[in-house]
From Swiss-Prot:
The gene is rnfB. Its EC number is 7.-.-.-. [4Fe-4S] cluster 2 binds at residues 114, 117, 120, 154. This is Ion-translocating oxidoreductase complex subunit B. It comes from Vibrio cholerae serotype O1 (strain ATCC 39541 / Classical Ogawa 395 / O395). It comes from the Bacteria. [4Fe-4S] cluster 3 binds at residues 124, 144, 147, 150. Signal peptide: none annotated. GO terms for cellular component: plasma membrane. Residues 32-90 form the 4Fe-4S domain. It is found in: Cell inner membrane. [4Fe-4S] cluster 1 binds at residues 49, 52, 57, 73. Its cofactor is [4Fe-4S] cluster.
Length: 195
């Protein structure tokens, strides 16, 4: 037999042996994940922004499973808090970040100051910044979560957080500001005072 055929057979045999060892090890040493952590992680928005105080959504999901508050995720908003409360069987909590009264902010890059270093692109957890090396970068406003992680790495301080302009889509009615009077409760009192 030729040396090439012997080498191919030897490599194939080694690959089969090591593949079998890896297959056995993956079954034997498999670590079961907590299913509740997986369910919580599926509800979280996966922005990995760190606004909750944890380095990403998975560590925050593990903390929630261990009893931490469910109201620390600004990108998820009130809808995420309600889903987490339903899953965990706890009361719906108000947001820890006062999301209803907080103005949504997005990153804005002053393009005349941008040097194209890509540090902001690397820091953005949701890929809301586009641009290339040594080229001007810009922010996709609809994708930006306002996490503020892109501001610190910028060497020229050309990124600032600006409030999102109010549009018909982002308008929030303050329905609790309108007082509601129950007419049926006030009618007997008015009749008693007339008598």
């Amino acid at each position: 037999m030729s040396t090439i055929v012997i080498a191919v057979i030897a490599l194939a045999a080694l690959a089969a042996v090591f593949g079998a060892i890896l297959g056995f090890a993956s079954i034997r040493f498999k670590v079961e994940a907590d299913p509740i952590v997986d369910q919580i992680d599926a509800i979280l928005p996966q922005t990995q922004c760190g606004q909750c105080g944890y380095p990403g959504c998975r560590p925050y999901a593990e903390a929630i499973a261990n009893g931490d508050a469910i109201n620390k995720c600004p990108p998820g908003g009130q809808a995420t808090i309600e889903k987490l409360a339903d899953l965990m069987g706890v009361e719906v909590q108000d947001s820890a970040h006062d999301l209803d009264n907080k103005v949504k902010m997005v990153a804005f890059i002053h393009e005349d100051m941008c040097i194209g270093c890509t540090k902001c692109i690397q820091a953005c957890p949701v890929d809301a910044i586009v641009g290339g090396n040594k080229a001007v970068h810009t922010v996709i406003k609809n994708e930006c979560t306002g996490c503020d992680l892109c501001v610190a790495p910028c060497p020229t301080d050309c990124i600032e957080m600006i409030p999102v302009q109010t549009t018909p889509e982002s308008w929030k009615w303050q329905l609790n500001a309108i007082p509601v009077v129950n007419v049926t409760d006030s009618a007997p009192a008015a009749q008693k005072s007339a008598n």
